[in-house]
Amino acid sequence: MYSPTMPTMDSVAKFKAALNSERGALGPFMITSDPAFVEAAGHAGYDFALLDMEHGPGSFQNLQNLIRAANVAGVCPVVRVPRGTDIWIDRALDVGAGAVLIPQIDTAEQARAVVSAAKFSPVGSRGTC
């Protein structure tokens, strides 16, 4: 069943294909609470819209609206979470992020921890209902 807050497989597949292409993936870095800007990015043909929750003005409710706009426009919602805390990673994925960007990772141990936080058990530590 389709949920308007979950990224469409087309937008995620388009983003992954662009990442692996010679051109690379193109998308704006967005510090906004206005879904219209995210929708415009999709209609402009970008591969992703990077939604900044580290420095941006948004809440989880606002993030859900931004993600919904990305899905309407067919652009992959990539969410930059603050400092890679497990709760932010979990909630960003729960509200429909197609990918997460984790800032300020300095060690391999930190990288392993955030990968684990993004994956469900038994592979990772992300919680389930």
Question: Where are the language model's segments positioned?
Answer:
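N-terminal amphipathic alpha-helix/helix-capping segment at the start of soluble metabolic enzymes
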Residues: Y2-I31
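Hydrophobic faces of well-ordered beta-strands that scaffold small-molecule active sites
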Residues: G24-F29, A49-L51, P77-R80, V100-I102
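Short, acidic/polar
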Residues: M30-H43, R83-R91
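Glycine-rich, proline-tolerant flexible connector loops at the mouths of alpha/beta enzymes
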Residues: F37-N65
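Glycine-enriched alpha-helix->loop->beta-strand junction motifs that scaffold or abut catalytic
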Residues: A44-F48, D94-A99, K119-F120
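Short, ordered loop/turn segments at secondary-structure junctions
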Residues: M53-G56, P82-R83, I105-T107
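Alpha-helix-loop-beta-strand connector modules within alpha/beta enzyme cores
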Residues: F60-D86, D90-D94, A118-V123
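Conserved anion-binding
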Residues: I87, A99-C129
